[in-house]
Amino acid sequence: MELAVVGSSEFVTGFRLAGIKKIYEAKSDELESVVTKVLKDSDVGIFVIHEDDFNKLPEILRDTLSESVDPTVVTLGGTGESSNLREKIKQSVGVDLWK
């Protein structure tokens, strides 16, 4: 399983420097099609997207991403990101690791 990152060039640069191979730069108008493409990739286990980009997606796609376990979707960059990550880990593993 691989990590995939979708977002603006500024958002994905750090992930690219860290050696992540599945990097998808996407402008606002391309976001929905790129996210759909990543969701269909069976090699992706964790999908990272900026919270602002996540909020730009249609509600139906946001719901799909929020409920997705494979891949697990993690939003970064907004308020409350720690609790979001905690919930995603709890959802995918089945245990609250912070307790």
Swiss-Prot record:
<dbReference type="Pfam" id="PF01990">
    <property type="entry name" value="ATP-synt_F"/>
</dbReference>
<keyword id="KW-1003">Cell membrane</keyword>
<dbReference type="InterPro" id="IPR008218">
    <property type="entry name" value="ATPase_V1-cplx_f_g_su"/>
</dbReference>
<comment type="function">
    <text>Component of the A-type ATP synthase that produces ATP from ADP in the presence of a proton gradient across the membrane.</text>
</comment>
<protein>
    <recommendedName>
        <fullName>A-type ATP synthase subunit F</fullName>
    </recommendedName>
</protein>
<dbReference type="GO" id="GO:0042777">
    <property type="term" value="P:proton motive force-driven plasma membrane ATP synthesis"/>
</dbReference>
<comment type="similarity">
    <text>Belongs to the V-ATPase F subunit family.</text>
</comment>
<keyword id="KW-0406">Ion transport</keyword>
<dbReference type="GO" id="GO:0005886">
    <property type="term" value="C:plasma membrane"/>
</dbReference>
<keyword id="KW-0472">Membrane</keyword>
<dbReference type="GO" id="GO:0046961">
    <property type="term" value="F:proton-transporting ATPase activity, rotational mechanism"/>
</dbReference>
<dbReference type="InterPro" id="IPR036906">
    <property type="entry name" value="ATPase_V1_fsu_sf"/>
</dbReference>
<dbReference type="GO" id="GO:0046933">
    <property type="term" value="F:proton-transporting ATP synthase activity, rotational mechanism"/>
</dbReference>
<dbReference type="InterPro" id="IPR022944">
    <property type="entry name" value="ATPase_V1-cplx_fsu_bac/arc"/>
</dbReference>
<keyword id="KW-0375">Hydrogen ion transport</keyword>
<keyword id="KW-0066">ATP synthesis</keyword>
<dbReference type="GO" id="GO:0005524">
    <property type="term" value="F:ATP binding"/>
</dbReference>
<comment type="subunit">
    <text>Has multiple subunits with at least A(3), B(3), C, D, E, F, H, I and proteolipid K(x).</text>
</comment>
<keyword id="KW-0813">Transport</keyword>
